[in-house]
Swiss-Prot record, chain A:
UniProt GO BP: negative regulation of BMP signaling pathway; positive regulation of gene expression; positive regulation of neuron differentiation; RNA polymerase II transcription initiation surveillance; snRNA 3'-end processing
Protein family (similarity comment): Belongs to the Integrator subunit 5 family.
Disulfide cross-links: none
This protein's name: Integrator complex subunit 5
Keyword line: Cytoplasm, Membrane, Nucleus, Transmembrane, Transmembrane helix
Subunit structure: Belongs to the multiprotein complex Integrator, at least composed of IntS1, IntS2, IntS3, IntS4, omd/IntS5, IntS6, defl/IntS7, IntS8, IntS9, IntS10, IntS11, IntS12, asun/IntS13, IntS14 and IntS15. The core complex associates with protein phosphatase 2A subunits mts/PP2A and Pp2A-29B, to form the Integrator-PP2A (INTAC) complex.
Basic and acidic residues: compositionally biased ranges: 571-583
Region: Disordered, residue numbers: 559-586
Any Gene Ontology CC annotation: nucleus
A GO molecular-function descriptor: DNA binding
Known function: Component of the integrator complex, a multiprotein complex that terminates RNA polymerase II (Pol II) transcription in the promoter-proximal region of genes. The integrator complex provides a quality checkpoint during transcription elongation by driving premature transcription termination of transcripts that are unfavorably configured for transcriptional elongation: the complex terminates transcription by (1) catalyzing dephosphorylation of the C-terminal domain (CTD) of Pol II subunit Polr2A/Rbp1 and Spt5, and (2) degrading the exiting nascent RNA transcript via endonuclease activity.
Subcellular location: Nucleus membrane; Nucleus; Cytoplasm
Ranges annotated as spanning the membrane: 769-786, 810-826
Curated annotation (Swiss-Prot), chain B:
Protein name per its UniProtKB record: Integrator complex subunit 8
Span of the annotated motif WFEF motif: 19-24
Bias kind Polar residues: ranges: 56-78
Record keywords, A-Z: Chromosome, Nucleus
Notes concerning its domains: The WFEF motif is required for the recruitment of protein phosphatase 2A (PP2A) to transcription pause-release checkpoint.
Organism, as annotated: Drosophila melanogaster
Main localization, broad class: nucleus
Its job: Component of the integrator complex, a multiprotein complex that terminates RNA polymerase II (Pol II) transcription in the promoter-proximal region of genes. The integrator complex provides a quality checkpoint during transcription elongation by driving premature transcription termination of transcripts that are unfavorably configured for transcriptional elongation: the complex terminates transcription by (1) catalyzing dephosphorylation of the C-terminal domain (CTD) of Pol II subunit Polr2A/Rbp1 and Spt5, and (2) degrading the exiting nascent RNA transcript via endonuclease activity.
Ranges of Low complexity composition bias in the record: 79-97
Top-level taxon: Eukaryota
InterPro entries named in the record: Int8
Lineage, broadest ranks: Eukaryota, Metazoa, Ecdysozoa, Arthropoda, Hexapoda
Length: 994, 1007
């Protein structure tokens, strides 16, 4: 019964189907489909027909899909769904269109739930069907993606694909193989239209498919090297989007074979792969990725060895130019590739060809302002670091390539340019001096680009970094001795700046521009300098304070003879404990010092503060102050040579500023003098006065008692006679031998002053020296009263004695004052302005000599302070031409006189002379060259006898010692003038005859 | 009188002999003198004897009992203290001289004869005897006896010798007969001594007169002394010279010539037979010596020299071993004298040669100094003086020598100074001063001469010096270093250190590095790469000639595209582009295009010189090619392009003045002239605008006036130029040309006018302002915008002030429609722009301060003000002038400081006002400082107004801050601030404090 029924149904089915060709509506009736599905279960014999029917259904659906031809040709997306949703006809035919869905659902459930044998069957059928349909209805060639999009919109195709997919999951290993076989067979048959299916389905067993595709490609390639591999490439390209790992694995596998060819086919592997890359960027990318991953030095050898084999392939031989551009198409690892090539370039010409070609192309593209994938690669963070590293390479090719790449990317990304400059500046080129070449070329920029970024922001960037570095101390612990980034940067900037000076060395950077750029950065440089130097200055001060404290303590214990050994011992103990820390500090300071030297060198090299640059006043002030601070810091350098070198640096610096700007000179000189007198006097032999700390006041001493000790009143702080503190004994006085200024440092200091004062363009300009002179008056003299030039009546010195003694005391405290006066004495008439100081010295000496008279039996020691002071004062007067000859020789003989006589001489010859001849510039004659000079040889300038005779008479009484001087001072000149006098020997003869 | 320091009388030693004992025992004197150390000494005896016998004519009143007192005192009287001797001559009262002794010598004196009493005579004899014991050594006498005593001795000598009382000085017409008591020989001796003393006294005249005067008794003696000293010396000289010339034998006293009186025996006078005869040589030597001294004293140096020589020869003539009785010349003294006269037999010292050379126009000075470098005898300071003197005399033209001499002397001094460790006169400027001369060789030469003679310690000094030299000599240091190495002074460590330091000075030479390559390395042999390299070179080269060569080379490679398209970024301005494109395809086309494109590229990179040179080459190339009619046109266009580039360069490098501004201005005028003349071809608008702005910056206004205003971008420059010209015409604070004002104002409209003119909005204004360079143009623009700001802000507290301000209208129609914000921003920008070109313009600094203050940025405002003040006074070297800081600015600064919480600073600033506004002062002082840079007591040293200090003292007292109060009080007590000081001092002290305060501010705000 059932059977009959079945047969009837079958008959009906066959009829319907055979007639149905003309009328799709009939075929797609759901009843019929159900019937067919029923057969599938009940009549296995009809399976073929049923499947045929299903195929028919699918075809109808496809036809329906294709017919309106409403697909967008580019994307493959049918326009219908979107735009023509309301199309009536479409709606009408919807059941037909959807008919295959029923089949699909049914078959799918069969696959899922039915016996496993269904799967291969259905899979094979579906594949066949899909292949057939695809081949039949593909009107024109589309890319794989487009095909996929196009076909998958079709419900039948989509259903079939889903089916195949479901089946594949159920397959066993051998079945799978078979399926793949079928698929590939299909692919062979319809290589043009089947590719999208392979690509689409390949995802199910990607590796296998990929491998097979490759194998199949290679076979075709071996057969005919001119063959087109679009499909293969297409499939691979498509699959790569999801299955790059498998592709890579496949490549890896193939390359392994390719590099070690066993089969004849293997020889073609490399050429084949390379050819394939021409078809697709993604494949290329993958291949490169693989290559870069597995690349080793050995492999390179292999490549070189095998290359002739590959080259025998004609296609490959001809494709080199295209290969050369390959790198431009890389999204990643492009830079790595190029650098790898560059590393080998020295060895292999082909690498150079490759490099040169690639780079040339690259630069051309940049000039044309075209965008390309490699740019993205270059802009990667990692690539940047890699390139920076390569810039430091010793391999010139590598370095060059890195620089060129950086230049290329900089044209589009200025920030990378700045970062690169900043980075390269921070590196040390002590080991590889070549490295600086990269920096220089980079600074040269990419020629031909109109809007290539300038390098100034790069400098600013690095300086900003360093400022932070210097300000926030040592963020990371660094092993001692390693050059810091700040150090490197400045040393590199220095090299650059020095190179520009020697013109011919660096054609890439215009000296002027570099200079300008660095000068623009001056505020930043100064900030760093400020930080560095100020820390060093603090260090000096601290050291000095400690040293004085030690010295004072020692002296005091010597004075009071009650050494507290215990206390000392404790002190030393502390010392040793502190040492490691101090070492670190020392080390830091040494680094800082080196940095300071470098910065000053740089400032000199870029001629900071010269007349040609426009500077704001605060900057001028800052530069000037820092220069002076640096000078004093330089004085604390360890060796003579370094001290001298540091000083010379600061001279150049000082001189440039001071001759450019008056205000700079003012500041420099003031700072120099102030610091020498008040802050860093200890460097220049200042008498050290230790400030007792309050805590040492004995506790039992009540405040009221202390108050009794110190007289109160307006002038209590002005008393000179502080030789000690009541209750604490005399002020410890250092032995006189230590009172001298260290000669070397003194000389350095004087040169610094001279550098500020000297005007190279107007050599006889004494403005600077006069300024020093006035400064000394301001700083040494106690107040503004009596600071005029004239010498008053000697009587009047009583009024000024107190301030005179304070001034004298200043000279005792700071011996360097003498030297400063000595310097300005040589530049007449500058010393005139210090008249008040000379007056004070003269007055105090005079008084002291007079005072000695009381105690006349006490002999005057040759090196007595008073005698030295008198001598120096006389020398100063002589040097500055404030007193004329023969008084100028007074300093030579003064020590032969007794105190009363000295007092007399000082008053009669010196004081009175100066009183009548006011030390003022008016004394001097200015010649055409602007030189101030007093011609003391002329008759006019002869000293009136009242100033000389006292000396002459005194000398006459000491002829036995002063005979020669007498002759030289008085007689020689006289006789020379009255030249007519006869030979004395003639007279002698007459006497003889008598 | 009760001086605790005065030594108390010491009890007499046992053996001390009292003076009267000698009167009693005539032998006592001989015995006494023969002792090894007689007490009292011979000199003391003389003094005592003389003080016992004052002038015979003298009248003095002795107090009763003074004799006794005298007896007690005199022995202790060890020195010539006349005050004590004062009461002595009690026995010599007139009555006594008349009555007591009458010890007249048997030889009857003439009526004027010796009218002495016995005691006087006895004492005189004793006195002369002692003097004879001392051999009449005038030196010794002079040294130990007061002048008055010497005169007395001399008088006594004469008196006794002539046998009659004489007064010193001897009268002019002195012709005393020798009385019976006298003796001719003795008289001659005495006269000789007299004349010698007369001359000698001249030498100590001053001193003698100043010597402490005897209090009362010796009044007359002093007068006598004066007379004696004033006696003319010529007769004495003549006398002594005669004496020298005469051959008459000369006798001197023997100790036994004088016979002391005995109490019992009247005696028969002196024993003049016992006298020494001395050789004339001895006499002459002594006399010549004295004469020489006298001549020296009176500056008759020639005579002195003769006398000294005579003295010496005479002394030499005396046979050695002879005992000299009369001549007391010590060899050292003689030598001194001879040396003083310059006739010493000793070899001339270096110093002497040196002095000689100075007098002889510096002959041989170099060799002397060279010698001295080794011997180091001449004081260094003298050498330095000579160096400077040579410089002076060469400079004034007195000395006809080359600078070479100066250089050599200086070099030798520098070398000498090496060993003057720490001399304060060392030459520190040698290298700078003589940097244009070849200053190193003389130095090295001098050094090499020195080197073998250096001690170890000196080598250290030498090292320091060499280091210094090396560091000085930038370029030549290598060579010097080689020389120095040759000296072998330095250890290897030191050499390394030096090398390290020198490294800094030498330019680095990059070898084998990228920087030394002219292009990228290209080893590839492929032709494509070659072509690529050529193209790259074409792109990067900066030289027209290279371009030409490369173009030829490239042409040969049969390129696929036109050569001018090699670099797409080459671009050519429009009129030229059409011209070039119209050319036939040729070398010239490529060449022109490439050069123009490259020039433009170079100009944008700031390489103006190469750009201009390229265009110049192109211009001449075009002229050479003689290409039809377009040559003229082309050249003209290129010239304008050149001008354009040069204007850009000039504006960019304004302060370096790269070009001849005059000619540039001329060319700008020409260029604008083309527009004016209505030529068929006019320059590009860009170029026209640049020209106009350039002329504005060159302050050449008239040519701008005649231009067509309609040309859009020219509008602003023209309006500015017109304003300037009107300002010149008006010469006064009159409102002028409103054109510029209106134009400027329109830029700040909230809603820019549409289409009214080609100019619109802030951006075009900025574009114009950006290219302003001249100070006055800046000033004008700033004042204009400043005025707009003032009107719009309408807040007199925050008014800006500047020059030119009064030129502009005082009101604006409908101010609401203008944007104050953009005015502020533009002004801020313009000020910083202007200050970046002229950072020392005080009025702008102040204005910026005003603006900052108006915005509320107090700190930056203060910075600007302080900057202005510091700049205006050259860091406080010049007094603060009114144009730098007037009351207006100071008040604003006070406001700033107060706003910043620095009330003390504000207080100090109040003193800067013309009239201190105590209201503000007290208000500020009572505020508590809220800024760590400010404190009440930090600025006491900057206050000069005493009222202010008083207030502070009071304030501290109120607050109970004792120590601060004391400090303030001590400030008030300084002499400088005394209200009674004269104006100058007051001004000075205020000035000092002002600058001190300003410097403090500068350190706080500017550093």
């Amino acid at each position: 019964m059932l059977r009959q029924n079945l047969l009837d149904q079958l008959k009906h089915f066959i009829e319907t189907v055979s007639n149905g060709h003309s009328c799709p509506q009939l075929l797609t009736s759901p009843n019929l489909i159900k019937l067919a599905l029923g057969f599938l279960e009940e009549l296995p014999a009809t399976r073929d027909i049923v499947f045929e029917y299903f195929a028919l259904l699918a075809e109808i659906s496809v036809q329906l899909y294709v017919s309106p031809e409403m697909a967008d040709p580019k994307t493959g997306m049918p326009v219908s769904q979107v735009k023509l949703a309301g199309n009536r006809q479409q709606q009408q035919r919807a059941p037909e269109y959807e008919a295959f869905n029923l089949v699909k659902t049914a078959l799918q459930s069969l696959v899922w739930k039915g016996p496993p044998a269904w799967s291969p069957l259905i899979a094979n059928w579906s594949l066949e069907l899909v292949a057939k349909l695809s081949d039949k209805y593909t009107q024109r060639r589309m890319t794989i993606t487009a095909s996929c999009n196009y076909w998958l919109e079709c419900s039948a195709m989509h259903g079939l694909m889903t089916l195949i997919n479901s089946c594949f999951r159920k397959l066993t290993q051998p079945e799978e193989e078979a399926c793949v076989e079928i698929m590939l067979n299909a692919f062979h048959r319809f290589p043009m239209t089947f590719d999208w299916i392979v690509a689409r389905l390949g995802g199910c067993f990607p590796y296998k498919i990929i491998m097979q595709i490759l194998q199949c490609g290679i076979k075709r390639f071996v057969d005919d090297y001119r063959c087109h591999l679009d499909s293969e490439a297409g499939i691979l390209d498509y699959m790569t989007s999801c299955h790059e790992q498998h592709l890579r694995a496949a490549f890896r596998e193939m390359l392994r074979e390719g590099f070690a060819p066993k089969k004849p086919l293997d020889v073609a592997v490399v050429p084949f792969l390379l050819i394939t890359t021409n078809y697709s960027d993604t494949i290329l990318q993958s291949l490169v990725n693989v290559l870069v991953e597995i690349y080793t030095e050995d492999m390179c050898e292999v490549i070189v060895q095998k290359a002739p084999l590959w080259l025998s392939n004609k296609m490959f031989a001809g494709m080199q130019p295209t290969l050369n551009n390959a790198v431009l198409r890389l999204n990643e690892r492009g830079a790595t590739l190029l650098l790898t090539a560059a590393k080998m370039a020295e060895k292999y010409v082909w690498c150079q060809d490759f490099l040169d070609n690639s780079m040339q192309e690259l630069e051309q593209w940049v000039l044309n302002q075209r965008n390309f994938p490699l740019l993205a690669d270059l802009a990667y963070e990692e690539t940047k670091y890699m390139l920076w590293k390569s810039c430091l390479s010793t391999n010139l090719f590598e370095q060059q390539t890195a620089v060129r790449l950086l230049l290329v990317v900089s044209s589009q990304h200025p920030n990378i340019y700045y970062q690169t400059i900043s980075q390269l500046l921070k590196k040390s080129y002590a080991q590889n001096p070549n490295g600086i070449g990269a920096l220089i070329r980079l600074l040269g920029g990419q020629s031909g680009m109109v809007n290539f970024p300038g390098f100034t922001p790069g400098f600013k960037m690095v300086l900003e970094d360093i400022t932070l570095d210097v300000q926030v101390n040592n963020r990371l612990p660094v092993p001692p001795g390693t050059p810091t980034e700040a150090f490197n940067t400045f040393s590199n900037l220095n090299i650059l700046a020095r190179m520009h000076k020697s013109k011919n060395v660096a054609p890439y950077i215009k000296a002027q521009h570099l200079n300008q750029a660095l000068n623009e950065c001056l505020p930043k440089i100064l900030q760093i300098f400020d930080c560095t130097v100020n820390k060093l200055v603090l260090r000096i001060d601290r050291d000095a304070a400690e040293r004085i404290a030690d010295k004072f303590r020692a002296q005091q214990s010597k004075n009071s003879n009650n050494n507290n050994e215990l206390c000392n011992g404790k002190d030393y103990g502390k010392r040793t404990k502190l040492e490691p820390g101090e070492d670190k500090v020392d080390d830091e300071d040494a680094t800082r010092m080196r940095l300071a030297h470098l910065i000053v060198d740089l400032l000199n090299n870029i001629e900071a503060g010269s007349r040609t640059t426009v500077l704001r006043t605060p900057l001028v002030l800052k530069l000037a102050t820092l220069s002076v601070k640096y000078f004093f810091v330089g004085l604390t350098e360890k060796t003579v040579i370094r001290r001298a070198a540091a000083s010379h640096r600061s001279y150049t610096l000082l001189q440039r500023q001071c001759s450019a700007r008056k205000i700079a000179r003012t500041v420099c000189l003031r700072e120099l003098v102030e610091r020498a007198l008040f802050y860093h006097g200890h460097l220049l032999g200042q008498l050290e006065v230790y400030q007792l700390d309050e805590l040492e006041i004995p506790e039992h001493e009540h405040l009221i008692l202390q108050n009794l000790h110190t007289s109160s009143g307006a002038n209590s702080n002005r008393s000179v006679l502080h030789s000690g503190i009541i209750g604490r004994g005399l002020r410890p006085v250092l032995p006189p031998s230590e009172r001298n200024c260290d000669a070397e440092k003194q000389a350095l200091y004087l040169k610094a002053l001279n550098a500020c004062c000297a005007d190279l363009e107007k050599p006889n300009n004494v403005e600077g020296y006069s300024l020093v002179s006035l400064l000394l008056v301001e700083l040494v003299s106690t107040d503004v009263m009596y600071n005029g030039l004239p010498f008053p009546d000697e009587e009047f010195t009583r009024v000024t004695m107190e301030r005179d003694m304070l001034i004298r005391r200043a000279f005792i405290n700071s011996p360097v004052l003498w030297a400063v006066l000595g310097l300005i004495a040589g530049h007449r008439p500058a010393l005139c302005y210090s008249s008040v100081l000379l007056r004070a010295l003269c007055a105090t000496c005079l008084h002291h000599w007079r005072g000695k008279n009381v105690n006349r039996f006490q002999p005057t020691a040759a090196n007595d302070e008073l005698m030295l002071c008198t001598k120096k004062m006389l020398q100063l007067l002589a040097m500055s031409q404030l007193i004329p000859p023969p008084l100028t020789n007074l300093h030579l003989i003064i020590e032969h006189f007794e105190s009363a006589e000295i007092a007399l001489l000082l008053r009669e010859c010196i004081w009175n002379y100066l009183k009548d001849h006011v030390p003022s510039p008016a004394l001097f004659h200015v010649d055409n060259n602007g030189l101030h000079w007093r011609n003391t040889n002329t008759q006019l300038a002869k000293v009136p006898p009242q100033y000389v005779d006292p000396l002459r008479h005194l000398m006459q009484r000491k002829l036995s010692t002063l005979g020669p001087h007498y002759h030289q001072m008085f007689i020689m000149g006289e006789l020379m003038e009255g030249d007519s006098e006869p030979d004395p020997t003639a007279r002698l003869q007459i006497v003889e005859i008598d | 009188m009760d001086d605790p320091l005065k030594p108390k009388p010491v009890p007499l030693a046992a053996e001390t002999v009292l003076w009267f004992e000698f009167l009693l025992d005539p032998h006592k004197i001989t015995q006494h003198l023969q002792r090894p150390h007689p007490e009292p000494s011979a000199m003391e005896l003389i003094v005592q004897f003389i003080s016992m016998t004052p002038n015979t004519a003298q009248e003095s009143v002795g107090t009763p009992g003074s004799d006794l007192q005298n007896l007690n005192q005199t022995p202790s009287n060890s020195g010539p203290i006349p005050g004590v001797v004062g009461g002595a001559p009690a026995p010599t009262t007139p009555t006594a001289s008349g009555g007591v002794g009458m010890p007249h010598s048997p030889q009857r004196p003439a009526e004027k004869g010796l009218q002495l009493n016995r005691k006087q005579l006895a004492l005189k004899i004793l006195e002369l005897k002692v003097a004879t014991w001392l051999k009449w050594d005038l030196d010794a006498l002079e040294k130990n006896l007061p002048v008055i005593m010497q005169l007395a001795l001399l008088r006594d000598l004469c008196t006794i010798s002539y046998g009659c009382s004489l007064s010193i000085p001897l009268p002019n017409d002195f012709d005393a007969r020798i009385s019976a008591a006298g003796n001719e020989r003795a008289a001659r001796f005495a006269l000789t001594i007299y004349h010698r003393m007369l001359l000698r006294m001249q030498l100590i005249k001053e001193q003698a007169l100043k010597a402490p005067r005897p209090q009362n008794t010796m009044y007359q003696t002093v007068d006598q002394l004066q007379q004696f000293l004033d006696t003319p010396t010529q007769p004495s000289i003549e006398y002594l010279q005669q004496l020298c010339a005469s051959t008459k034998p000369f006798y001197i006293f023997h100790y036994d010539s004088f016979v002391p009186l005995r109490c019992d025996d009247i005696g028969n006078g002196q024993n003049y037979d016992v006298m020494h005869l001395i050789t004339p040589q001895e006499l002459r030597a002594q006399l010549h010596y004295e004469l020489a001294q006298y001549y020296l004293y009176t500056k008759q140096y020639v005579l002195a020299r003769e006398a000294a020589a005579a003295c010496n020869t005479n002394l030499q003539a005396i046979p050695p071993q002879t005992t000299l009785y009369y001549c007391h010349i010590r060899p050292s003294e003689l030598e001194g004298l001879l040396q003083a006269c310059g006739i010493s037999a000793e070899e001339q010292s270096l110093l002497e040669k040196f002095q000689q050379s100075l007098l002889n126009n510096y002959t041989d000075i170099v060799s002397i100094l060279r010698m001295d470098n080794r011997r180091r005898e001449i004081p260094f300071i003298s050498r330095r003086q000579v160096e400077l003197d040579i410089e002076g005399s060469i400079s004034t033209g007195i000395l006809k020598e080359t600078v070479q001499l100066q250089l050599q002397v200086a070099a030798l001094n520098v070398v000498r100074n090496i060993f003057e460790w720490g001399s304060i006169f060392g030459s520190v400027e040698y290298f700078e001063k003589y940097r244009e001369l070849d200053c190193l060789p003389p130095l090295v030469e001098a050094l090499q001469e020195m080197l073998p003679h250096c001690t170890f310690k000196e080598q250290a000094a030498l090292k320091h010096f060499l280091i210094d030299c090396l560091l000085h000599q930038g370029g030549q240091s290598r060579q010097l270093l080689q020389t120095v190495r040759g000296f072998g002074l330095f250890s290897s460590d030191e050499l390394q250190d030096i090398d390290e330091q020198m490294l800094q000075a030498t330019p680095p030479v990059p070898t084998n590095s990228l920087a030394s390559l002219s292009d990228w390395m290209c080893h590839s042999k492929m032709s494509r790469v070659d072509v690529g390299a050529l193209e790259r070179q074409l792109i990067s080269c900066t030289n027209a000639n290279t371009v030409r060569i490369l173009l030829v080379k490239l042409c040969a490679t049969a390129p696929g595209k036109p050569l001018w398209a090699i670099n797409p970024s080459w671009d050519v301005p429009q009129p030229l582009k059409t011209l070039i494109m119209a050319m036939p395809v040729s070398f010239l086309q490529d060449f022109s295009y490439v050069l123009l494109g490259k020039a433009r590229e170079l100009a944008t990179r700031g390489n103006y010189i190469d750009a201009v040179s390229m265009l110049s080459v192109l211009k001449s190339e075009n002229q050479r090619q003689e290409m039809a009619a377009n040559v003229q046109l082309m050249c003209k266009l290129i010239t304008w392009e050149i001008l354009h580039i040069q204007i850009t360069q000039c504006l960019e490098e304004w302060h370096q003045k790269p070009l001849d501004l005059q000619s540039l201005g001329g060319r700008c005028k020409q260029c604008l002239g083309a527009l004016q003349a209505g030529d068929s071809i006019v320059p590009r608008p860009d170029i026209l605008e640049s020209c106009a702005i350039m002329l504005l910056n060159l302050t050449e206004f008239p040519p701008l006036l005649y231009l067509d205003k309609r040309a859009g971008p020219l509008e602003l420059p023209l309006a500015f130029a017109a304003t300037f010209i009107e300002m010149e015409k008006m010469k006064g604070p009159k409102k002028v040309c409103r054109d510029a004002w209106e134009l400027m104002l329109s830029m700040f409209l909230n809603v820019p006018k549409r289409g009214s003119s080609g100019v619109g909005g802030i951006s075009s204004l900025q574009a114009f302002l950006q290219r302003i360079r001249h100070q006055s143009v800046f000033g004008l623009a700033i004042s204009m915008i400043g005025k707009v700001h003032n009107i719009l802000k309408d807040d007199p507290n925050h008014d800006l002030s500047c020059e030119y301000m009064q030129l502009w209208p005082t009101s604006i129609n409908n101010p609401v429609s203008y944007s104050l914000r953009s005015v502020c921003e533009t002004l801020q920008w313009l000020l910083s722009e202007a200050l970046s070109y002229y950072p020392q313009t005080i009025s702008w600094l102040k204005m910026k301060g005003d603006l900052d203050l108006a915005i509320g940025n107090n700190e930056s405002a203060m910075r600007c003000y302080v900057n202005a003040l510091v700049t205006g006074t050259d860091y406080c070297t010049m007094p603060l002038q009114r144009n730098v800081a007037d009351d207006y600015v100071i008040r604003k600064m006070i406001r700033c400081a107060a706003n910043l919480g620095c009330h003390m600073q504000a207080t100090v600033l109040c003193q800067f006002l013309d009239e201190i506004d105590y209201g503000i002062v007290f208000k500020n002082l009572s505020e508590k400082s809220s800024n760590f840079t400010d404190a009440m007591d930090a600025y006491y040293s900057c206050i000069w107004d005493t009222t202010l200090l008083e207030f502070i003292v009071n304030l501290h007292a109120k607050r109970g801050e004792h120590s601060r109060k004391l400090e303030a009080i001590s400030m008030m007590g300084t002499l400088e601030l005394n209200a009674n000081n004269n104006e100058e001092i007051k001004r000075e002290s205020a000035m000092v404090r002002k600058s001190r305060f300003l410097r403090a501010l500068a350190k706080q705000y500017l550093l």
